[in-house]
Amino acid sequence: MAHALLGPSSASRWMACPSSVRLCEQFEDVESEYAKEGSLAHEIAELKVKKLIDPGLTSRKFTSAMKKLKDKELYQEEMQGYTDEYVEFIQEQMYSYETTPHISVEQKVDFSQYVPGGFGTADCILISNDTLHVIDFKYGKGVPVSVENNAQLLLYALGAYLAYEMIFPIEHIKMSIVQPRLTGIDTWECSLDYLLTFAKKAQEKAVMALNGDGDFNNGEHCKFCKAKATCKARANANLELAKYEFKSVDLLTLEEIGEILQKAKDLDKWVKEIEKYALSESLKGNNIPGWKAVNGKGRRSFKNTDDAIKVLKENGIAEELLYERKYLTLAQIEKVIGKKDFNNLVGDLIVMN
């Protein structure tokens, strides 16, 4: 699927650091396994919402389509429970209106009127009377995403408003992020005036980005930047963190320890990103002065476990010595039976240590 140069998913970065846009053009797009897993979960969620709103999607067609998704390599049964939470939230929102709202799923929205070449795909859009509600499904479990002033969703809302402004008297904007593996559901609201003010700001940043203007800015937005490992501005910012000035006393205060730990955490993250990049370059045959890629010791394993066990048993090794029977961990059990059933059955038996 084609992505806009100034797309919604990277808006927090290009609005905070416009110069990063041209810099990132030097790097190829690489889709991680986590991203692929998220895409599959989105497909499942989309199918379920369509079953909810499309009378033409018969049970037979739905079952057939779901089977194809379940046959994919990255499919996990827990995806069913997590996507159910997203669908149930949409259903709740639909029923909260006095009249049946307009609803669209996986709709392409265009906001190029403000951001040149700007477009994206909104997971779900609900419109009733003067209210436009954008709902976004995030399957990741790494870092919670805040919905407040979220640039990605604001651009989705902007595109949806431009598409429907002649049909609905939109004055009120709602945005929700459903993160079932993390914080659950978060909603934030703003006025149309606020959205259009944001649009003007996005327009200014977009022009700067396309022209390669503005300074490079280090921050949380660097997390998903393709140039994060080799960006000199980020390197300078992180090296500044290392220049910690101590007061002329023999012992650190608790406040100083807290500050040092936070700086060390940020530095450690940056160094690991550089190490990962350096390793990938070494494996490509590029020379990193003073460093080289070496083979790790690795872990021993049988070429074929079944064959190995068979040989051991044939040579008098008792079968009970070769197996270990134990319960799965809490997380493994939840994954096997699904989050919803897990919580219903044993949720009240869980304690936090």
What positions do the PLM features span?
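Mg2+/Mn2+-dependent nuclease catalytic core
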Residues: 36, 99-207
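Extended, charge-rich alpha-helical segments
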Residues: 269-353
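Short amphipathic alpha-helical coiled-coil/interface segments
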Residues: 83-86, 90, 260-278
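Short, charged, low-complexity amphipathic alpha-helix
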Residues: 174, 196, 200-266
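Short, charged/polar micro-motifs that form catalytic or ligand-binding hotspots
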Residues: 27-35, 142-150, 215, 250, ...
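Short acidic (Asp/Glu) and glycine-rich catalytic loops that position anionic groups and cofactors
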Residues: 18-24, 176-186, 226, 238-246, ...
